[in-house]
């Protein structure tokens, strides 16, 4: 949806294409996304947009970073995150938390589903818990 970026737990990409090629293909759906914006998004998550390595050779953490780049390349007003730190090493988690906090400070609304209390503490102003289909405000 326009104005919304979504990060899923296990992003799927075309294995025989580079990270840039995958995002370029998706960007064709939104003609307003330039190659430079795609490259900037890839750089923001700590990947090299000029890297020709095929996504099939990416580590799980690299694919997760590319998924985050995909979600932010349209500069969405709202980011929906499903376990956004899955597959990232300690350094990657720290980098992505900093990026997401920066986006939040710039006015992006962030909705996060996570089992990680630290992600929730760092990224969320309000916390809700879902249990047996019931949603309860925690704080």
Regions found by a protein language model. Give the residues of each.
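Conserved ABC ATPase "signature" region
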Residues: 24, 33-50
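Hydrophobic anchor residue at the start of the ABC signature
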Residues: 68
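Catalytic Walker B motif of ABC-type/P-loop ATPase nucleotide-binding domains
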Residues: 79-83
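Helical segment within the ABC ATPase nucleotide-binding domain
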Residues: 94-106
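H-loop/switch region of ABC-family ATPase nucleotide-binding domains
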Residues: 114-115
């Amino acid at each position: 949806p326009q104005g919304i970026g979504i990060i899923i737990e296990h992003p799927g990409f075309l294995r025989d294409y580079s990270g840039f090629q995958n995002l370029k293909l998706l960007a064709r759906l939104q003609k307003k996304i330039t190659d430079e914006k795609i490259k900037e998004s890839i750089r923001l998550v700590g990947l090299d947009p000029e890297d020709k390595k095929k996504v099939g050779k990416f580590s799980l953490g690299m694919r997760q970073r590319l998924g985050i780049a995909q979600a932010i390349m349209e500069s969405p007003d709202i980011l929906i995150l499903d376990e956004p730190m899955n597959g990232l090493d300690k350094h990657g988690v720290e980098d992505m938390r900093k990026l997401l906090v920066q986006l939040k400070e710039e006015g992006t609304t962030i909705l996060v589903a996570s089992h990680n209390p630290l992600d929730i503490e760092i990224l969320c102003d309000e916390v809700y818990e879902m249990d047996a289909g019931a949603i309860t405000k925690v704080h």
